[in-house]
Amino acid sequence: MLVWLAEHLAKLYTGFNVFSYLTFRAIVSLLTALVISLWMGPHMIAWLQRLQIGQVVRNEGPESHFSKRGTPTMGGVMILVAIIVSVLMWANLSNPYVWCVLLVLAGYGAVGFVDDYRKVVRKDTKGLIARWKYFWQSVIALVVAFTMYSIGKDTPATQLVVPFFKDVMPQLGLLYVALAYFVIVGTSNAVNLTDGLDGLAIMPTVFVAAGFALVAWATGNMNFAGYLHIPYIRHASELVIVCTAIVGAGLGFLWFNTYPAQVFMGDVGSLALGGALGTIAVLLRQEFLLVIMGGVFVVETLSVILQVGSFKLRGQRIFRMAPIHHHYELKGWPEPRVIVRFWIISLMLVLIGLATLKVR
Protein backbone atom coordinates (compact mmCIF):
# COMPACT_ATOMS: atom_id res chain seq x y z
CA MET A 1 0.00 0.00 0.00
CA LEU A 2 2.73 2.46 0.99
CA VAL A 3 4.74 1.42 -2.08
CA TRP A 4 1.92 2.60 -4.33
CA LEU A 5 1.53 5.83 -2.35
CA ALA A 6 5.27 6.51 -2.41
CA GLU A 7 5.39 6.11 -6.19
CA HIS A 8 3.03 9.06 -6.52
CA LEU A 9 4.64 11.15 -3.77
CA ALA A 10 8.10 10.61 -5.27
CA LYS A 11 7.03 12.86 -8.14
CA LEU A 12 6.82 15.68 -5.59
CA TYR A 13 9.81 14.73 -3.44
CA THR A 14 12.46 12.21 -4.52
CA GLY A 15 13.11 11.18 -0.91
CA PHE A 16 10.04 8.97 -1.10
CA ASN A 17 11.95 6.70 -3.48
CA VAL A 18 13.38 5.00 -0.38
CA PHE A 19 10.08 3.10 -0.15
CA SER A 20 10.90 1.37 -3.42
CA TYR A 21 14.09 -0.16 -1.99
CA LEU A 22 13.56 -3.81 -1.07
CA THR A 23 16.11 -3.81 1.75
CA PHE A 24 14.50 -0.78 3.41
CA ARG A 25 11.03 -2.27 3.17
CA ALA A 26 12.28 -5.62 4.50
CA ILE A 27 13.70 -3.97 7.61
CA VAL A 28 10.65 -1.83 8.34
CA SER A 29 8.37 -4.80 7.61
CA LEU A 30 10.17 -6.78 10.31
CA LEU A 31 10.05 -3.86 12.76
CA THR A 32 6.39 -3.12 12.03
CA ALA A 33 5.35 -6.73 12.67
CA LEU A 34 7.52 -6.85 15.79
CA VAL A 35 6.01 -3.68 17.27
CA ILE A 36 2.44 -4.75 16.47
CA SER A 37 3.04 -8.14 18.07
CA LEU A 38 4.64 -6.63 21.19
CA TRP A 39 1.82 -4.08 21.49
CA MET A 40 -0.94 -6.65 21.03
CA GLY A 41 0.58 -9.18 23.43
CA PRO A 42 -0.49 -7.78 26.83
CA HIS A 43 -3.92 -6.79 25.53
CA MET A 44 -4.45 -10.18 23.89
CA ILE A 45 -3.37 -12.10 26.99
CA ALA A 46 -5.61 -10.04 29.28
CA TRP A 47 -8.57 -10.46 26.91
CA LEU A 48 -8.08 -14.23 26.66
CA GLN A 49 -7.82 -14.48 30.45
CA ARG A 50 -11.08 -12.57 30.90
CA LEU A 51 -12.80 -14.94 28.49
CA GLN A 52 -11.14 -17.91 30.23
CA ILE A 53 -9.77 -19.20 26.94
CA GLY A 54 -7.10 -21.49 28.36
CA GLN A 55 -4.97 -24.36 27.12
CA VAL A 56 -6.37 -27.89 27.36
CA VAL A 57 -3.72 -30.38 28.58
CA ARG A 58 -4.06 -34.13 28.07
CA ASN A 59 -4.00 -36.25 31.24
CA GLU A 60 -1.68 -38.77 29.57
CA GLY A 61 0.90 -36.07 28.80
CA PRO A 62 4.04 -35.30 30.84
CA GLU A 63 3.22 -34.28 34.42
CA SER A 64 5.24 -31.09 33.98
CA HIS A 65 2.57 -29.90 31.53
CA PHE A 66 -0.26 -29.98 34.06
CA SER A 67 0.78 -26.53 35.29
CA LYS A 68 0.10 -25.19 31.79
CA ARG A 69 -3.65 -25.79 32.13
CA GLY A 70 -5.52 -22.53 31.79
CA THR A 71 -2.66 -20.65 30.12
CA PRO A 72 -4.25 -18.42 27.45
CA THR A 73 -4.20 -19.92 23.97
CA MET A 74 -5.19 -18.76 20.47
CA GLY A 75 -2.41 -16.17 20.71
CA GLY A 76 -1.61 -16.95 17.10
CA VAL A 77 -4.22 -14.34 16.23
CA MET A 78 -1.76 -11.60 17.14
CA ILE A 79 0.93 -13.22 14.98
CA LEU A 80 -1.39 -13.27 11.97
CA VAL A 81 -2.59 -9.70 12.51
CA ALA A 82 1.00 -8.47 12.80
CA ILE A 83 2.08 -10.28 9.63
CA ILE A 84 -0.92 -9.30 7.53
CA VAL A 85 -0.87 -5.62 8.55
CA SER A 86 2.89 -5.36 7.97
CA VAL A 87 2.68 -7.05 4.56
CA LEU A 88 -0.25 -4.89 3.47
CA MET A 89 1.72 -1.81 4.47
CA TRP A 90 5.11 -2.60 2.97
CA ALA A 91 4.71 -5.14 0.16
CA ASN A 92 3.93 -4.40 -3.46
CA LEU A 93 0.29 -5.48 -3.52
CA SER A 94 0.25 -5.93 -7.29
CA ASN A 95 2.45 -9.00 -6.77
CA PRO A 96 0.37 -12.23 -7.00
CA TYR A 97 2.82 -14.22 -4.87
CA VAL A 98 2.14 -11.95 -1.90
CA TRP A 99 -1.59 -12.64 -2.16
CA CYS A 100 -1.04 -16.40 -2.44
CA VAL A 101 0.78 -16.45 0.90
CA LEU A 102 -1.76 -14.13 2.54
CA LEU A 103 -4.61 -16.37 1.35
CA VAL A 104 -3.03 -19.45 2.92
CA LEU A 105 -2.15 -17.52 6.07
CA ALA A 106 -5.70 -16.23 6.53
CA GLY A 107 -7.41 -19.43 5.36
CA TYR A 108 -5.40 -21.81 7.52
CA GLY A 109 -5.67 -19.33 10.37
CA ALA A 110 -9.46 -19.53 10.07
CA VAL A 111 -9.37 -23.34 10.13
CA GLY A 112 -7.14 -23.27 13.20
CA PHE A 113 -9.35 -20.66 14.86
CA VAL A 114 -12.43 -22.88 14.51
CA ASP A 115 -10.46 -25.85 15.86
CA ASP A 116 -9.23 -23.86 18.89
CA TYR A 117 -12.66 -22.34 19.49
CA ARG A 118 -14.31 -25.74 19.66
CA LYS A 119 -11.64 -27.02 22.05
CA VAL A 120 -11.36 -24.17 24.53
CA VAL A 121 -14.70 -22.36 24.30
CA ARG A 122 -17.15 -25.14 23.52
CA LYS A 123 -15.06 -27.64 25.56
CA ASP A 124 -15.03 -30.17 22.73
CA THR A 125 -11.75 -32.00 23.31
CA LYS A 126 -11.63 -33.24 19.70
CA GLY A 127 -11.94 -29.74 18.25
CA LEU A 128 -12.74 -29.52 14.56
CA ILE A 129 -13.34 -33.02 13.23
CA ALA A 130 -10.16 -34.23 11.52
CA ARG A 131 -11.77 -34.90 8.15
CA TRP A 132 -13.23 -31.39 8.03
CA LYS A 133 -9.92 -29.84 9.05
CA TYR A 134 -8.17 -31.79 6.31
CA PHE A 135 -10.92 -30.95 3.82
CA TRP A 136 -10.58 -27.20 4.27
CA GLN A 137 -6.79 -27.39 4.32
CA SER A 138 -7.00 -29.27 1.02
CA VAL A 139 -9.43 -26.82 -0.58
CA ILE A 140 -7.26 -23.82 0.28
CA ALA A 141 -4.05 -25.56 -0.80
CA LEU A 142 -5.52 -26.66 -4.13
CA VAL A 143 -6.93 -23.20 -4.90
CA VAL A 144 -3.52 -21.65 -4.27
CA ALA A 145 -1.67 -24.44 -6.11
CA PHE A 146 -3.78 -24.08 -9.27
CA THR A 147 -3.45 -20.28 -9.07
CA MET A 148 0.32 -20.50 -8.82
CA TYR A 149 0.44 -23.03 -11.66
CA SER A 150 -1.64 -20.80 -13.94
CA ILE A 151 0.67 -17.85 -13.21
CA GLY A 152 3.93 -19.69 -13.85
CA LYS A 153 2.95 -22.46 -16.29
CA ASP A 154 5.88 -23.65 -18.47
CA THR A 155 8.30 -21.16 -16.90
CA PRO A 156 11.09 -21.59 -14.31
CA ALA A 157 8.37 -20.99 -11.69
CA THR A 158 7.08 -24.54 -12.25
CA GLN A 159 10.42 -26.34 -12.47
CA LEU A 160 11.68 -28.76 -9.84
CA VAL A 161 14.91 -27.60 -8.23
CA VAL A 162 17.08 -30.46 -6.94
CA PRO A 163 19.85 -29.65 -4.43
CA PHE A 164 23.45 -30.27 -5.53
CA PHE A 165 22.50 -30.63 -9.24
CA LYS A 166 22.57 -27.33 -11.10
CA ASP A 167 21.39 -28.74 -14.43
CA VAL A 168 18.54 -30.90 -13.10
CA MET A 169 15.43 -28.71 -13.30
CA PRO A 170 12.62 -30.65 -15.00
CA GLN A 171 9.29 -29.05 -15.82
CA LEU A 172 6.65 -30.54 -13.53
CA GLY A 173 3.50 -29.74 -15.48
CA LEU A 174 0.41 -30.66 -13.46
CA LEU A 175 2.61 -32.54 -11.00
CA TYR A 176 3.42 -29.06 -9.72
CA VAL A 177 -0.11 -28.87 -8.29
CA ALA A 178 0.25 -32.21 -6.51
CA LEU A 179 3.65 -31.25 -5.08
CA ALA A 180 2.41 -27.83 -3.97
CA TYR A 181 -0.61 -29.42 -2.28
CA PHE A 182 1.54 -31.94 -0.42
CA VAL A 183 4.09 -29.34 0.72
CA ILE A 184 1.53 -26.77 1.91
CA VAL A 185 -0.71 -29.20 3.80
CA GLY A 186 2.23 -31.24 5.09
CA THR A 187 4.18 -28.26 6.41
CA SER A 188 1.09 -26.83 8.07
CA ASN A 189 0.50 -30.02 10.02
CA ALA A 190 4.22 -30.47 10.75
CA VAL A 191 4.47 -27.08 12.47
CA ASN A 192 1.25 -27.89 14.32
CA LEU A 193 2.78 -31.10 15.69
CA THR A 194 5.94 -29.26 16.73
CA ASP A 195 4.02 -26.68 18.75
CA GLY A 196 4.06 -28.65 22.00
CA LEU A 197 6.51 -26.76 24.22
CA ASP A 198 6.98 -23.09 25.11
CA GLY A 199 8.60 -21.39 22.14
CA LEU A 200 9.50 -24.66 20.45
CA ALA A 201 7.69 -24.04 17.16
CA ILE A 202 8.00 -20.28 16.81
CA MET A 203 11.80 -20.01 16.82
CA PRO A 204 12.41 -22.60 14.08
CA THR A 205 9.66 -20.81 12.13
CA VAL A 206 11.59 -17.55 12.53
CA PHE A 207 14.85 -19.20 11.46
CA VAL A 208 13.29 -20.80 8.37
CA ALA A 209 11.50 -17.57 7.40
CA ALA A 210 14.77 -15.65 7.73
CA GLY A 211 16.49 -18.22 5.53
CA PHE A 212 13.77 -17.97 2.92
CA ALA A 213 14.04 -14.17 2.98
CA LEU A 214 17.60 -14.54 1.70
CA VAL A 215 16.55 -17.15 -0.85
CA ALA A 216 13.68 -14.95 -2.07
CA TRP A 217 16.04 -12.02 -2.52
CA ALA A 218 18.46 -14.15 -4.57
CA THR A 219 15.68 -15.82 -6.60
CA GLY A 220 14.21 -12.45 -7.55
CA ASN A 221 17.60 -11.07 -8.60
CA MET A 222 18.63 -12.22 -12.07
CA ASN A 223 22.36 -11.90 -11.38
CA PHE A 224 22.38 -13.79 -8.09
CA ALA A 225 19.97 -16.43 -9.38
CA GLY A 226 22.35 -17.07 -12.26
CA TYR A 227 25.35 -17.15 -9.93
CA LEU A 228 23.68 -19.73 -7.64
CA HIS A 229 22.21 -21.72 -10.56
CA ILE A 230 18.66 -21.40 -9.27
CA PRO A 231 15.66 -20.29 -11.36
CA TYR A 232 15.14 -16.56 -11.70
CA ILE A 233 11.52 -15.90 -10.74
CA ARG A 234 10.28 -12.38 -11.40
CA HIS A 235 7.74 -12.16 -8.58
CA ALA A 236 9.92 -13.81 -5.93
CA SER A 237 11.62 -10.74 -4.48
CA GLU A 238 8.45 -9.43 -2.80
CA LEU A 239 8.35 -12.59 -0.69
CA VAL A 240 11.27 -11.05 1.21
CA ILE A 241 8.73 -8.67 2.78
CA VAL A 242 6.45 -11.55 3.75
CA CYS A 243 9.34 -13.49 5.29
CA THR A 244 10.65 -10.56 7.31
CA ALA A 245 7.12 -9.87 8.56
CA ILE A 246 6.95 -13.47 9.79
CA VAL A 247 10.31 -13.01 11.52
CA GLY A 248 9.18 -9.82 13.26
CA ALA A 249 5.80 -11.18 14.33
CA GLY A 250 7.43 -14.40 15.52
CA LEU A 251 10.00 -12.61 17.65
CA GLY A 252 7.29 -10.41 19.14
CA PHE A 253 5.22 -13.47 20.00
CA LEU A 254 8.25 -15.22 21.50
CA TRP A 255 8.49 -12.37 24.02
CA PHE A 256 5.33 -13.78 25.62
CA ASN A 257 5.68 -17.42 24.58
CA THR A 258 9.14 -18.07 25.98
CA TYR A 259 9.36 -20.44 28.97
CA PRO A 260 7.27 -20.25 31.10
CA ALA A 261 4.77 -19.18 28.44
CA GLN A 262 2.20 -16.47 29.12
CA VAL A 263 0.30 -17.44 25.97
CA PHE A 264 0.24 -20.23 23.38
CA MET A 265 -0.29 -19.71 19.66
CA GLY A 266 -2.83 -22.52 19.30
CA ASP A 267 -3.79 -24.10 15.99
CA VAL A 268 -4.75 -20.68 14.64
CA GLY A 269 -1.06 -19.82 14.68
CA SER A 270 0.69 -23.11 13.97
CA LEU A 271 -1.47 -24.22 11.04
CA ALA A 272 -1.24 -20.77 9.42
CA LEU A 273 2.51 -20.34 9.88
CA GLY A 274 3.23 -23.84 8.60
CA GLY A 275 1.00 -23.30 5.59
CA ALA A 276 2.72 -19.98 4.86
CA LEU A 277 6.20 -21.54 5.01
CA GLY A 278 5.09 -24.33 2.69
CA THR A 279 3.61 -21.84 0.23
CA ILE A 280 6.77 -19.73 0.23
CA ALA A 281 8.90 -22.83 -0.40
CA VAL A 282 6.72 -23.79 -3.38
CA LEU A 283 6.74 -20.27 -4.83
CA LEU A 284 10.54 -20.14 -4.58
CA ARG A 285 10.85 -23.69 -6.01
CA GLN A 286 12.73 -24.77 -2.88
CA GLU A 287 10.68 -27.67 -1.55
CA PHE A 288 13.81 -29.75 -0.93
CA LEU A 289 15.44 -26.82 0.83
CA LEU A 290 12.41 -26.63 3.15
CA VAL A 291 12.99 -30.26 4.13
CA ILE A 292 16.55 -29.36 5.15
CA MET A 293 15.94 -25.99 6.82
CA GLY A 294 12.72 -27.19 8.43
CA GLY A 295 14.32 -30.43 9.57
CA VAL A 296 12.98 -30.03 13.10
CA PHE A 297 9.43 -30.04 11.73
CA VAL A 298 10.24 -33.07 9.57
CA VAL A 299 11.68 -35.08 12.47
CA GLU A 300 8.75 -34.21 14.73
CA THR A 301 6.33 -35.43 12.06
CA LEU A 302 8.28 -38.59 11.30
CA SER A 303 8.39 -39.44 15.00
CA VAL A 304 4.59 -39.44 15.09
CA ILE A 305 4.29 -41.49 11.89
CA LEU A 306 6.84 -44.05 13.13
CA GLN A 307 5.23 -44.23 16.57
CA VAL A 308 1.74 -44.85 15.19
CA GLY A 309 2.99 -47.26 12.53
CA SER A 310 5.08 -49.27 14.98
CA PHE A 311 2.24 -49.54 17.48
CA LYS A 312 -0.24 -50.70 14.84
CA LEU A 313 2.12 -53.20 13.21
CA ARG A 314 4.08 -54.52 16.21
CA GLY A 315 2.07 -53.39 19.21
CA GLN A 316 5.18 -51.60 20.49
CA ARG A 317 6.18 -47.96 20.74
CA ILE A 318 9.52 -46.65 19.49
CA PHE A 319 9.50 -43.52 21.65
CA ARG A 320 8.24 -43.00 25.18
CA MET A 321 5.86 -40.46 23.70
CA ALA A 322 5.43 -38.69 20.37
CA PRO A 323 6.08 -36.12 19.01
CA ILE A 324 9.71 -36.64 19.87
CA HIS A 325 10.09 -33.56 22.08
CA HIS A 326 7.89 -35.32 24.65
CA HIS A 327 10.19 -38.36 24.46
CA TYR A 328 13.08 -36.26 25.73
CA GLU A 329 10.92 -34.72 28.44
CA LEU A 330 10.02 -38.19 29.71
CA LYS A 331 13.72 -39.09 29.66
CA GLY A 332 14.20 -36.38 32.26
CA TRP A 333 15.33 -33.40 30.18
CA PRO A 334 14.01 -30.11 31.59
CA GLU A 335 11.68 -28.37 29.15
CA PRO A 336 14.00 -25.37 28.55
CA ARG A 337 16.83 -27.75 27.62
CA VAL A 338 14.69 -29.52 25.03
CA ILE A 339 13.54 -26.21 23.58
CA VAL A 340 16.94 -24.54 23.29
CA ARG A 341 18.63 -27.64 21.87
CA PHE A 342 15.93 -27.92 19.21
CA TRP A 343 16.48 -24.21 18.45
CA ILE A 344 20.21 -24.81 18.02
CA ILE A 345 19.56 -27.75 15.70
CA SER A 346 17.09 -25.65 13.71
CA LEU A 347 19.59 -22.81 13.26
CA MET A 348 22.26 -25.28 12.13
CA LEU A 349 19.89 -26.83 9.60
CA VAL A 350 18.98 -23.43 8.15
CA LEU A 351 22.66 -22.58 7.70
CA ILE A 352 23.31 -25.98 6.11
CA GLY A 353 20.33 -25.46 3.82
CA LEU A 354 21.60 -22.06 2.70
CA ALA A 355 25.04 -23.54 2.07
CA THR A 356 23.55 -26.13 -0.30
CA LEU A 357 22.52 -23.32 -2.65
CA LYS A 358 26.15 -22.88 -3.62
CA VAL A 359 27.15 -26.55 -3.54
CA ARG A 360 26.04 -27.49 -7.06
From Swiss-Prot:
Any single Pfam family the record assigns to this protein: MraY_sig1
Subcellular location per UniProt equals: Cell inner membrane
The record ties this protein, via CDD domains, to: GT_MraY
Which UniProt keywords are listed? Cell cycle, Cell division, Cell inner membrane, Cell membrane, Cell shape, Cell wall biogenesis/degradation, Magnesium, Membrane, Metal-binding, Peptidoglycan synthesis, Transferase, Transmembrane, Transmembrane helix
One GO MF term on file is: UDP-N-acetylmuramoyl-L-alanyl-D-glutamyl-meso-2,6-diaminopimelyl-D-alanyl-D-alanine:undecaprenyl-phosphate transferase activity
Q: Name the EC number(s).
A: 2.7.8.13
Which cofactors are required for activity? Answer: Mg(2+)
Annotated protein name in UniProt: Phospho-N-acetylmuramoyl-pentapeptide-transferase
Organism whose genome encodes this protein: Pectobacterium atrosepticum (strain SCRI 1043 / ATCC BAA-672)
The beginning of the lineage is: Bacteria, Pseudomonadati, Pseudomonadota, Gammaproteobacteria, Enterobacterales
